[in-house]
């Protein structure tokens, strides 16, 4: 009898989640494409005096080749290291001075960067994203690549090699996908 009550309670709890499944969250937005092909999605919310800029590139570790992995994640790091009009070290410094929180991440299918900052600093975030998108090569050097390669290696040691079960995130994809599938290797490289 006790098992029956527990089972009934579980089904009741699971079923109660479906009662709200019909509700949809509607977020109004405007979507347009710039002449250079960049898709822009804008959602306005004036309830707080902050703005978020989120730039997504349709490239991730899934775009890499067998035996040549980790480049998407490496470039995620390199794109913080200055560009044609932004000296090395100034990207984060300028954003922090404006009261921003920023970061980037890489997955199998995308690399993204975001800035969350006061509304009056929107132009700064757009300038920085535009400059790193258009003028990265002006500031590239073998030293920057080597420096960030070392940072990524250290990140791998901290988050995978020296963590309980950390290696599982490297082993799991190898066992879920065929060796030639772009999801069979870890994002970090």
What residues fall within each predicted segment?
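Bacterial N-terminal signal peptides that target proteins for export
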Residues: 1-8
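His/Glu-rich zincin catalytic helix
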Residues: 6, 18-92, 114-117, 123-130, ...
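Hydrophobic helical h-region of N-terminal Sec-dependent signal peptides
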Residues: 9-13, 17
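Alpha-helical protein-protein interaction elements
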Residues: 10, 24, 48-49, 65, ...
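A ubiquitous, low-specificity "background" feature that marks scattered single residues
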Residues: 11-12, 51, 79, 135, ...
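Acidic/histidine-enriched segments that form metal/cofactor-coordinating
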Residues: 57, 83-84, 90-189
